[in-house]
Amino acid sequence: MEGAIERVFVAGAGLMGHGIAQVHAAIGRTVTLFEPDLERAEAGRDRIAANLERSVSKGRLTREEADTTLARIEPTADLGRAADADLAIEAVFEELAVKTGLWRQLDGIAPAEAIFATNTSSIAIHRLAEAVDEARRPRFVGMHFFSPVPVMPLIELIRGRDTSDATIEAIRTLASDLGKHVIVSGDKPGFIVNRILMPFLAESMRAYEQGIGTAEDIDAGARIGLNHPMGPLELADFIGLDVCLGIMRVLDDGIGGERFRAPRVLEELVAAGNLGQKTGQGFYTYPRTAQASGG
């Protein structure tokens, strides 16, 4: 791709998508934030406004900086707004069919020279790139942010089978502009971080379901004994138990083995609609304030 990335189209205004939109707007990019339902897109922009307001109240941003950042973000329910994008970032539900369906539509809308970046946390990039025309695949890349996006300084960059050097360098440059540290992963399920993290979470859940320790003691063991900032069960609640389950299923399907298999307790919690902080109940119970910040 030639030229700088100035216009960014973000598909998905949830926990990850609105954070991705915010950080790009903060460095001067023009951002279109898409959801099929305009109210959901506007809700994503409202969450960004609330985030910026907190930063102003804490002295991290001036009022002018916050207002200017928010003004660069336009919510939309029109996928056709991707027609002038330099970069399209997908941050929708972690399911192959959902993601490929969206990419297939965007492939017919976005400019031929636009970069396509997926925020998938586990699905192999080459499987997603199959949804677009072969000519587009050199500009298809994995760009995995971490939550909360404005705070977490890491981006996992994943090169697909056909991803070009020029695309990798363009995203590296953008990540640097965003103030993020880049790690580069091979195109295997789970990449680096979740390949390490999910077996740890799964084994912690198995220890819980087998009565080896309470949730509090398992988490304290990790925080105090392993010097982790959060215990594994509270971290799973923070990520979202449905998200954890989806990633484990991708890993189990793509790699296999007991270490990647979702524990029964996780399956049961998700089936009951107890998804962690965002629903108020997971391995722990959360107040309404935690629920409000989870989506």
Regions found by a protein language model. Give the residues of each.
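NAD(P)-dependent Rossmann-like dehydrogenase/reductase catalytic/cofactor-binding core
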Residues: 2-4, 13, 27-29, 166-169, ...
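Short glycine/serine/threonine-rich phosphate/pyrophosphate-binding segments
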Residues: 17-19, 99, 121-126
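Rossmann-fold dinucleotide-binding core
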Residues: 115-186, 191-194
